[in-house]
């Protein structure tokens, strides 16, 4: 056991985590040169296209150190985006140490900080690594100072490497073996294994990634899931080198995969403890804290026949993504679908793309909303995650919106722009600290503004230099209203949105204008209105298409023309009473962009 090292690689987006993982795999000979490809651990197509890591991946490698010993390295490549920080915290729970990778050109960024604090809270050994030293813009001395100044860990002898060229990567491994402690645990005690992650394989059923904390797991053992009490047979187990390799046993301290022929998706939840049925452990390992979704949106299949397969797809995805929340929802405009909870807008986009790609579904998404706390006049407190669930205005005593605490790191030059943006988003400044030419800003901004497009706008006002980390702080009373959209005097529930009263006029007007361009013209006038309660705040009309009934007259008497026009008018009137308006899918997507600057 003393030769096992479990560690994660944590860093801000694009600081070179996945490339460093590639080099480590190459040096330890996990894959032959022929099988080696860039970002070998980003196995999803989506990850490769966007160049980001979404799922944490684990690998077991053997490394022969300079002291002549051979060490077994179990390492986990983690995502850098703020939306996937729960993936990072789950990976860290399986480790004794973490490599904090910092780009020697960019320096410390917000996510570097957030991930590092997560690691420190879990009492992990953090080893700083300065990456990309081959860049002309690299300034390792300055960045080492920044790490000490902002993060507060000793970085005087931080390892310098370039993952792209491979310089210094062996030093990283040597330092790792030296500084990260071996796993603690009792190899002879009762089995306790923590489920770090799981996914669904069409042939094998549920595959789980486990970290053995105590005891040993052997092939063919009877294994019990502690939360449900069900027992399964350990059919196959093994490690990733990144290829799946079968083993006969997983020893104490190792990280590996396990197949128990679990067909039920909820059979082995992530964060649960596995133990042996013969000699069970007394208590379960502390799991992970449940992540609360921050953004909710309705997802509806375009054709209602897909509802069943959509439900199965969500089930399989939620197994792989523990933070995805969903419940059935029906809408008069869109039929049956699900209300889903996500951690942020990127997470929502990724889930939607994965559903469309991996499960061949066509989906319509409604506007994302956050959870509001509503105190009714009957003094009840309810939580509302969809505009259609909001009680009528006169039943609401107080409406509270979630406030996010946003930590931003940015160069001084962009401070003015960023502060202007935060004020525009109804933010309140709580802290500002200067570190060299970097500024650390803390603002409290309503969550609804953060999830809409704050991140994109922050990046564009600071030319990509500012970085952001946010978390939920509290609920705060606020003057929010629901804006309804009426088409021909009928409310369309899927188009409603909740917004602050100050912005409601402009949002309503903008929405109505957008809808006017998107709804195809019919044979009769279509009135589109935005309303708060019964008060109409904006209106526009999609003009009717009409045939020129006078074309056949050629001159002729005025009364003849009047008769024809009158007849047409009556026909249109009848049509309007019975006519239905078909809303195109673009109309629903239009709301997603309301309130965003059309840059």
From Swiss-Prot:
EC number(s) from the headed UniProt entry: 3.6.5.n1
Main location: membrane
Keyword Electron transport: no
UniProt xrefs under PROSITE patterns: G_TR_1 (PS00301), G_TR_2 (PS51722)
Annotated binding of GTP, by residue: 14-19, 131-134
Any matching Pfam family: EFG_C
Domain of life, source organism: Bacteria
InterPro entries according to UniProt: EF-4, EFG_III/V, EFG_V-like, EFTu-like_2, G_TR_CS, LepA_C_sf, LepA_CTD, LepA_IV
Role summary: Required for accurate and efficient protein synthesis under certain stress conditions. May act as a fidelity factor of the translation reaction, by catalyzing a one-codon backward translocation of tRNAs on improperly translocated ribosomes. Back-translocation proceeds from a post-translocation (POST) complex to a pre-translocation (PRE) complex, thus giving elongation factor G a second chance to translocate the tRNAs correctly. Binds to ribosomes in a GTP-dependent manner.
Assigned protein family: Belongs to the TRAFAC class translation factor GTPase superfamily. Classic translation factor GTPase family. LepA subfamily.
Name of this chain's protein: Elongation factor 4
Organism: Salmonella typhimurium (strain LT2 / SGSC1412 / ATCC 700720)
